[in-house]
Amino acid sequence: MTEKKWQKKWADEKLFESNPNDKEKLFITVAFPYPSGAMHIGHGRTYTVPDVYARFKRMEGYNVLFPMAWHVTGAPVIGIADRIKRKDPWTLNLYENVHRVPKDELPKLEDPEYIVRYFSSEYNEVMHDMGYSIDWRREFRTIDPTYKKFIEWQITTLYEKGLVQRGEHPVKYCPNCDNPVGDHDLLEGEGVGVNELTLLKFQIDDKILVTATLRPETIVGATNIWLNPDVEYVLVKANDEKWVITKEAHYNLEQQIKDLDIISEINPNDLIGKMAINPFTGNEIPIFPASFVSASYGSGVVFSEPADAPADYIALKDLKKNEELISKYNLEEIIENVVPIPVCTVKGYGEIPAADIIERLGITDQNDEKLHEATNELYKIQHSKGTIIDSIPGFGGKKVRFAREELKEELISKNMATIMYDFAERPVVCRCGNNCVVKIMDDQWFMKYSNPEWKEKTHEVLNRETIIPPEIKNNFNYYIDWLDDWACSRKVGLGTRLPWDNKWLIEPLTDSTIYMSYYSIARFLKDMNPDDLNPAFFDKVYLNKDSDDIKVAPEIVEEIQNEFNYWYPLDWRLSAKDPVGNHLSFLMFHHSAIFPEDKWPKGTVVFGMGLLEGNKMSSSKGNVILLKDAIEDYTADVVRLFLMASAEPWQDFDWREKEVLGTKRRLEWFREFAGKVEEIKGSALDLTNIEKVELTRTIDLWMLSQLNQHIKASTEALEVFQTRKALQESLFLLKKDIDHYIYRVNHLLDKKDPAVIYVLSTVLESWIRLLAPFTPHTCEELWSNYGGKGFVSVAKWPEVDESVISSEIEKSEELVQNLIKDINQIKNMVGEDAQKVHVYLAPDWKWDLYKIANDVGKPDIGQIMGRAIGANIYDDKKEIAAVAKKVGREMTKTKYVGKINEAQIIDDALEYISNEVSSEVVVHTDDSYDPQNKARNAMPYKPAILIE
């Protein structure tokens, strides 16, 4: 097979093994994979983008390092192994039928380290099959003993700077694993944030209804409390108080509040219709039934503030119309008196903002999908621009965002409220299969991302970086400011132990922030004794700190240090968009804290998501195509080509079989074109020894001009990772131009015309190199078959020959095509067989007028005429005026490139034009034969036409 052949040749020649030399370096990395399952086509896009860029820069003459490793730390594989051991049907089906693990291998996956070995080995194989130009000498796993020593040094360095501290903090937590969890540990809920909720205490008899809210300032407008009559509530002891919350809320809250014991179950129906006391106002408010109240979010008890909460407004409105519920709970006398109480004022809304937005969006009931949109819109604008109404004592006139915090603190200080934490959305499911909760950890180690000085320095890193796409920079700024202390240790999983507290393991997002620097020296460390890799060693290599504690020989340390200094800083970091709020931001934090400024990363590219036939890809749901299957079905080059052409890297791509098949056909055409060029030549092609020919025909010059324009545009696109645009230029548009050229010179193809052979050979030679980063196997094969020297993978990237790019030549071919189009349109309108077509060309004075108009730069007829008359370009001023008006209209549509020799251009293409219009064509440079006075209509770039 062609692809296997070239992969072996590259490996045998060690083509992509990169060592320091005197070339300019380019160091590119992509997020290393967590190999807990098979590679799918989404992964294919992730790892093909950096490979295309690496290959491109290598051909540009850079010394390129593109390494790969395996991120295997953390608890996910522990959970997978446990579920397989328990014979969990869903997990067994996933690994047998989606990840395609052979049945005899499945029992071995009960060992988490075997999972890591199995899938990292499979990833390695598939990456080879995709033709990735990786320096495999630098491969490692994050549980390798030498890597663990590196992580110990990293965490110790941060600890000594006071950036790792023990403390109390809310974290995502799996009670089953007894472990904090990060996104990598989750089956569902990746990227879900943790909200701080205020628990407000509404007294009812000797009990307290504890309501959870994100907006404590709205308590002044509370009209009622909502309880869900269909869920289980419990009475719990909280210090000296008795709280009413849902049973599910108790499960969550006991991870945050100590000694939260259940006293008894409580029937919500016994409370509905009774009155509770608002802790802030002292007013009594009723308790109403509401099926929309979630048992699992917050406390399961909600106060209603219909003036500013669209959901509360519409729920109250619906309840007032529900005679059955009103009768069931005897609410007739109470409910009529419940009306919205104004709290916030914001420009563009009335006294009751919720009513305004519900009316504007046409929301009719609680089931309306637009209700969520209304809530988000109103909450957002009130938080940013809203103020508390003047009539509220102590807070009137204050901005909502300030009043919220002040009122919360006042309520807490008076024991009218407390704090809890919950997920912004659910479910959040650990890879072990259990639901996660938010837990307050009081013996946990944290990264102090809350440190303001550290944040400021991290912003400096960001400001120096090139971010692609640029708009993502705002996201980074947001997350750098937003990030709080981060739980950086775990009790369960694979990984490196905290050097000073070895009951804890370093969690997987913390041990993957500066590993790019490890790539630079990994090839040396593989065979070294881990015990020799103490902090003093890494201090010397990375920070040039001398120490008597270094155990490695000085000459080896120097070589390793030189390697690091050659490759660092990292030029480009590529990753999906999900890690912007964690891994990619952590990378900037850690680089700012550990490395000097000249070692800070230089650029980041953020990817979009992958779809499969319009639906989101998900391994856990089986909605994926394995990359190895796609390679087998279509070849690696087709897969690469489709992934790079379907969307820019930061856009979402959609794998559609019909379009993939179309891509396959285009690649087949490319191969066929190479054979066709050799067939036209009539002898073996030698792309390194193309016989140059002096070109005179416009169409030949046009083809080389177009080729070089595509080279230029493709190069510019690739420099900024625009793979789709690069392929639009170097494949699709170039192919269109080649098709046109071949059609134009069709009558010469069997005549061994030297110019045609030269042009097509030149195009093919450049085209192979242009597509080599995208379809390396195909291009190596063609390069080898048609006389290319060495590997095209390291051949010189096509240089733009500016001397052959000509707007005049482009305009010349445009003239020919427009002339054919105009003649055929007129013939169709006339409806008669034309024996002869007369073409009249514009006289010189009209060209002079066009130049004057171009110099004026705008359709200012007065200026154009004035200059034309002053230059005495033509005697008939009335005619100048008429033509000047036409020029004024045309100059906004037609680009002026200077005078072109229309007579020669048309004469050059006369046979082609005559064939295309099926008539004899006669060209006139004057009006000596002009029976219908058509010549006067001739304009530059647009000849006049007479049909006979």
Question: Which residue ranges define each predicted feature?
Answer:
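Residue patterns forming the tRNA-binding/recognition surfaces of aminoacyl-tRNA synthetases
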Residues: K4-K5, K9-E13, D82-V220, M275-I277, ...
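Alpha-helical recognition segments enriched in aromatics with Gly/Pro capping
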Residues: K201-I204, I277-F280, E284-Y297, P306, ...
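C-terminal low-complexity, glycine/proline- and small-hydrophobic-enriched intrinsically disordered tails
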Residues: L661, G790-E948
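Acidic, turn-prone loop/beta-hairpin segments
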Residues: H71, L187-E188, A684-T715, Q728, ...
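N-terminal catalytic cores of NTP/NDP-binding nucleotidyl/phosphoryl-transfer enzymes
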Residues: S18-A81, T142, I151, T211-L214, ...
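Protease-associated
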Residues: P216-V301
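Amphipathic alpha-helical
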Residues: T2, W6-Q7, Y159-E160, V164-L186, ...
